[in-house]
């Protein structure tokens, strides 16, 4: 790789990083940029990154190189204590890979982020949180770029975290209202599950192959070629962790409940986050780990099943929504499920093309969402009457006795939130509440204080709907919080 391609590859990441630094440092120093200056900085940063990526593509086409690798070395190295051991220790390698998977997703991210940035400049004009939005937007762009071109799972994790952090704060953008903050917290919890699975996958990769490099895991060939360098059982275990990470980020069933709640954010963030880019990160991760699916048929079947369940859930739920942003979010979910199923079937280019086309379409639809009623009136005026309304296809072909059941199931969004609360959240809270009391009992005994015996696990009170139950059990509650209201359904 010559100096030309190295410089272009570096600029692709450096431009959004400098944008985040410029906006973030100015905010910390309380010397915020003006709206026109912020808009110009954003446009220039996205333009530099996009032109650098296009120049890199031109260089690759001219030289016939299947990919370009920029290795920035190990930023962290932890050597084993025993010098005679065969274990190589831990190292955090920063490696960027530009290949047939990362470049299309990178170009898609930059084009759509640039479009949304220009739209948000006008949409949020004179909004009190204008500067805060663009700081989070810059963080999101940098996260998407890093995730797109990551050559190691550690680099991908950094970008993954930046996307998740900025997404949560954008959901809770309107902080003066309680609903966006509650829904942002819900998104944060699901993202934490996804992040934990990805972190466990990173640790497992180091235990299996001694590094977090995707080339070592996937055989070193340029995407989509390559073969997994681990056994079938190891591929299944590692792949299941990556599937959980993808499920959390892409809202696959059963972790789909956060997606409509994420619509509390501004329309620009809804378009670029949950309609176009971040909702596809799970599918992108599965595409990157494609050789693992080839090595483990059981893993491929699991991916197909989760994808089809998500597609069906999104299809039925989207058809009963009463607001446009929720309807679009569930429609996006249905397409993401189909993309995931295509990946599980062993296809690589078809889901990539599907992903790009779907992201562009949803971005346009989300941007036009605020003017939907006006567009509808213009269309009716043009045809001189009301538009004909026809029941959905599934309503026409479903027997009458099943319609009410399916309709109610779709209205209740599959009862996924309730099932997760009963089967996962309450048992975990009950267990850790009991462990907390047991720990307090042990520390009080060591300190010479007396405390009642810890209750049996079955008698630990479950968390109440308003969240006061487990806080009181942990010793932090001070009675009900009158300002807290249940989650909106």
Predicted regions and their residues:
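...captures the hydrophobic TM-helix bundle architecture rather than a specific catalytic motif
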Residues: 1-439, 443-489
């Amino acid at each position: 790789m010559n100096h030309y391609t190295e410089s272009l590859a570096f600029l692709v990441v450096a431009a959004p990083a400098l944008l985040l630094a410029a906006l973030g440092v100015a905010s910390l120093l309380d010397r915020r940029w003006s709206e026109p200056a912020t808009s110009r900085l954003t446009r220039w940063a996205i333009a530099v990154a996009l032109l650098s990526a296009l120049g890199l593509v031109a260089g690759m086409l001219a030289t016939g190189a299947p990919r370009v690798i920029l290795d920035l070395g190990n930023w962290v190295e932890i050597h084993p204590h025993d010098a005679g051991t065969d274990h190589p220790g831990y190292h955090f390698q920063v490696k960027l890979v530009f290949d047939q998977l990362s470049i299309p997703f990178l170009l898609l991210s930059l084009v759509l982020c640039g479009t949304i940035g220009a739209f948000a400049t006008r949409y949020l004009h004179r909004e009190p949180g204008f500067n805060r939005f663009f700081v989070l937007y810059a963080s999101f762009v940098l996260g998407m770029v890093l995730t797109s071109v990551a050559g190691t799972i550690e680099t991908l994790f950094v970008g993954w975290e930046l996307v998740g952090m900025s997404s949560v704060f954008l959901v809770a953008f309107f902080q003066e209202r309680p609903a966006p903050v509650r829904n942002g917290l819900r998104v944060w919890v699901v993202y934490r599950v996804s992040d934990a699975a990805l972190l466990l996958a990173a640790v497992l990769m180091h235990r299996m192959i001694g590094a977090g490099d995707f080339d070592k895991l996937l055989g070193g060939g340029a995407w989509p070629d390559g073969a997994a360098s681990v056994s079938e059982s190891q591929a299944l275990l590692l792949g299941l962790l990556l599937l959980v990470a993808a499920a959390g980020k892409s809202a696959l069933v059963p972790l789909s409940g956060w997606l409509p709640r994420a619509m509390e954010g501004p329309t620009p963030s809804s378009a670029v986050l949950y309609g176009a880019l971040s909702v596809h990160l799970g599918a992108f991760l599965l595409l990157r780990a494609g050789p693992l699916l080839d090595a483990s048929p059981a893993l491929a079947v699991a991916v197909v099943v989760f994808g089809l369940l998500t597609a069906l859930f999104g299809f039925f739920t989207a058809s009963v929504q009463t607001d446009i942003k929720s309807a679009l979010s569930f429609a996006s979910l249905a397409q993401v499920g189909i993309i995931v199923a295509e990946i599980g079937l062993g296809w690589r280019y078809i889901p990539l093309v599907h992903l790009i086309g779907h992201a562009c379409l949803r971005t346009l639809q989300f941007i036009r969402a605020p003017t939907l009623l006006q567009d509808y009136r213009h269309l009716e005026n043009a045809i001189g009457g009301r538009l004909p309304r026809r029941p959905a296809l599934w309503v026409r072909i479903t027997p009458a006795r099943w319609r009410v059941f399916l309709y109610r199931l779709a209205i209740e969004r599959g009862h996924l939130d309730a099932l997760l609360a009963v089967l996962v959240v309450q048992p975990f809270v009950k267990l850790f509440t009991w462990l907390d009391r047991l720990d307090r009992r042990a520390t009080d005994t060591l300190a010479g204080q007396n405390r009642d015996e810890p209750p049996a696990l079955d008698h630990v009170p479950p968390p109440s709907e308003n969240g006061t139950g487990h806080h009181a059990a942990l010793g932090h509650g001070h009675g009900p919080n009158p300002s807290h209201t249940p989650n909106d359904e």
